Amino acid sequence: MTFSKQLFLYLFFLFPLLHASHPQQCSSSSCGRDDVHVRFPFWLLSKQPELCGHAGFNLQCTASPKTALKLPNSGTFLVREIDYLSQQIRLYDPENCLARKLLTFDISRSPFSALYLVSYTFLSCPNEVAKSSRFDSIPCLGNSTTSFLATTSLDLAKSMLPSCQIVKTLDVPVSRRVIAKKSRFSTDVNDKDLWLKWDSPSCSDCERDFLRCGFRSNTSLQVKCFPFENSGYNTEPQVLKIILLSIIGPLTIFATCIAVGVCTSERFASLIQRNVAIAALQPNEVIVTTGLDESIIESYKKTELGESRRLPGNNDDIVCPICLSEYASKETVRCIPECDHCFHSECIDVWLKIHGSCPLCRNSPSPARQAV
């Protein structure tokens, strides 16, 4: 074999190896051109792999298209802004009636918490009373006979009794502390955005250093900082990549010119045909990630925790790895066969319906075990 043929074949097999040594990173995505940018710990359900985000941080695109977050027990909200450095997310109601969702708002089963809480008292009043009091009502909650009012002053709310009835007093997540206004009712509770924060996973250090945050490995829920491929920082892998490309580039041009002559020979044509035949016998492996049927999930063992809150088997965790909440007595946990990892039953049920694998070790139970 001549030197030119050896050089061509060397480069032919070298390029796939170089590409394999630098796997594609999880790049940011968005639902629309002017919409929020989505990156770790968030991930878009229809546009990014599940390994690009953390459990509980999955977003989805609406038909608008807008970015939406579905909170357990609280409904779906649209995302107006994500501050990755401060680890805050700003939400608003797509139906422009935030007050209605606040009456049943609950984020205890999500990874989010409030920046600040302001106590609001909601009242229902006959329309005649509301109009005569000259207080602003919340339009989207009222009807032909009843109006709804909201105030940060409990004393003001009590002064409306017995003509009005207190519906509920609740804490509303806001972006800053608010001083209660004792002299008036307000409709701004319906106009405000919800401000939530997350403490885990902690990626603020990565954002501060202009690095991307991600899982340490495919089998770990721990996170670390990685350099962006296009961040412009002079990291060692990037320098090595530039050196390799500066050497391979001229060699590629030289090998291409020689390959034009080589391709005319029957021997080279035979080599190509043989490689194609071998490749045809080796189909690419396709990995499809699907969730499990509810019947299979229900077959996995459930256990009610006692006063010791000790998990079955050799598990010594004190918090659920999915929702990051501590286990409590009388709570129900479900354990995955084979790996024996345990979680809150309501958390792992939702996870397995989407992913079909353990969120800790990423192993899927074998068909034989699922049928048990």
Curated annotation (Swiss-Prot):
It catalyses: S-ubiquitinyl-[E2 ubiquitin-conjugating enzyme]-L-cysteine + [acceptor protein]-L-lysine = [E2 ubiquitin-conjugating enzyme]-L-cysteine + N(6)-ubiquitinyl-[acceptor protein]-L-lysine. It is a single-pass membrane protein. InterPro entries: ATL20-22-like, WAK_GUB, Znf_RING, Znf_RING/FYVE/PHD. It is an enzyme of class 2 (transferase). Keywords: Membrane, Metal-binding, Signal, Transferase, Transmembrane, Transmembrane helix, Ubl conjugation pathway, Zinc, Zinc-finger. One of its GO terms (cellular component) is membrane. One of its GO terms (biological process) is protein ubiquitination. The chain crosses the membrane at residues 242-262. The RING-type zinc finger domain mediates binding to an E2 ubiquitin-conjugating enzyme. Belongs to the RING-type zinc finger family. ATL subfamily. This is Putative RING-H2 finger protein ATL21A. The gene is ATL21A.
